A protein has these predicted regions:
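Catalytic core segments in nucleotide and nucleic-acid processing enzymes
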Residues: 1-177
Length: 178
């Protein structure tokens, strides 16, 4: 069950499971096309509909995800790869998973992790500023609360994308004790 994401997100040894199950949840519950990529010089996955695309990076950390310029730079590279779409810059051509129908200004970035700590918000602003691209961070708890909202008919795909505001997404008040 998807609830196990709460534990997997805190287990660095299960990073791949975290990627796979997170993307499966987006596909099966949020009803957004999701492709798992991962590997060298590729984001962990992409989400897309005909009108938008999201570059996804998942991080499984026991103590939460804190600001890392190296990881911001990695996301910036993915965003730039997708903008330029130049195989001589990145021969993996991972961006070809996005449909050609997506307008150039309708791409987003997303980090998913157990929790976001310390100055993580600075990583979001820095990445957005460097790429002129809107992004977000989504904790596993909010990912699950969002899924519950989707199932109840309260969270549409449009509302999901509209919640990308270069900050952490909060669909509902936390029900976990930190």
């Amino acid at each position: 069950s998807y609830i196990e994401l709460l534990e997997i997100a805190r287990d660095g040894k299960r990073s791949r499971d975290f990627e796979l199950i997170t993307m499966e949840l987006f596909k099966n519950i949020y009803k957004i096309n999701a492709i798992v990529l991962g590997g060298a010089r590729k984001p962990d996955g992409v989400l897309y509909m005909p009108e938008f695309g999201v570059i996804v990076d998942t991080k499984a950390y026991a103590d939460g995800y804190s600001k890392s310029i190296a990881q911001a730079d990695e996301m910036i590279r993915y965003i730039e790869d997708n903008k330029r779409r130049d195989p001589s810059r990145n021969s993996t051509k991972w961006w070809e998973h996005f449909p050609t129908s997506i307008p150039a200004n309708n791409f987003y970035f997303l980090w998913v992790s157990s929790v976001f700590v310390n100055k993580f918000h600075e990583q979001l602003s820095y990445t957005a500023q460097e790429t002129q691209t809107v992004g977000a961070a989504l904790s596993v708890e909010q990912l699950l609360l969002g899924a519950d909202s989707v199932l109840k008919g309260n969270l549409t795909t449009k509302k999901f994308i509209d919640s990308f505001k270069n900050q952490e997404i909060v669909f509902a008040p936390s029900i976990l004790h930190s």
